[in-house]
Amino acid sequence: MPDTYGYEVDEKRARETLNTIFDGPVNFLDTSNNYGFGRSEERIGDALRERGGLPEGFVISTKLDRDMESGSFDASRARQSLEESLKRLGVEKVQVLHLHDPEHASDLKEITRSGGALDELFKIKEEGLADAVGLAMGKLDLMESILWDWPFDALMNHNRWNVINRSADSLFKKAHERGIAILNAAPYASGVLAKGSDVMPRIAYQHATTDALEPVKALEMICAKHNVPIGALALQFSTRDPRITSTAAGVTKPERVQQTLDWATAELPDELWEEIENINFSSEDPEANREYKPG
């Protein structure tokens, strides 16, 4: 997904990374019908078939996606999306299934009307093809307008609850009070809070301006002072939040799996958490000016 992350991952490295995940203590993997135009699910499915199936107790989460050419996202497309995903993954059902990115559909009414894609999502759950269903997207205002009108088990939001952007705070509070499981994605702001501002000067899948990188550089200085990897700070900012059920962080190398586990369990001093509260964070939409390119 070079347009999203700025680089590609070859087949061999992807397989090695997946096997490291399946062999370790991690028990949750998130993907989507349209990630890499289906290549993500295909790679996961190939790895699972080679292993003889999904490890016991492992949770696969995927997402229903619109037709990527027409933008159509009616009930028929939702069902087709599921069928494509099950075939690629080589499974009969998934543990978690989200409706994905309605903000990019050609007609929102196809999704929300009676008999639309959302009704199809809950029908899929009733049929036992998904254990839990959710809404996965970015735009908070649209997410909130949909979220309370259906009995979602979960939500997934990205890039809007991390050390440098806290715009999802209000929505997460309301969702938690209603008992909706919160899956917080992109704790590294799409990479800069893991690899650093010099290596990965991108925020929310876009090249970041000098001004946008200022809080990142300030955090890097604080982390260096305390001898703490900025990735550990970014990851634990999410994992220590009692409202958040699970944090979805991307890994593209086998060694990143163990690094993520190390970051998640690293002991961070109280002084660090106190100091970062003095850093300016954004409450604005991090994708307001993004030129979206699917895949």
Question: Model-flagged regions — what are they?
Answer:
Residues 1-58:
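N-terminal binding-site loop/beta-alpha segment at the start of enzyme catalytic domains
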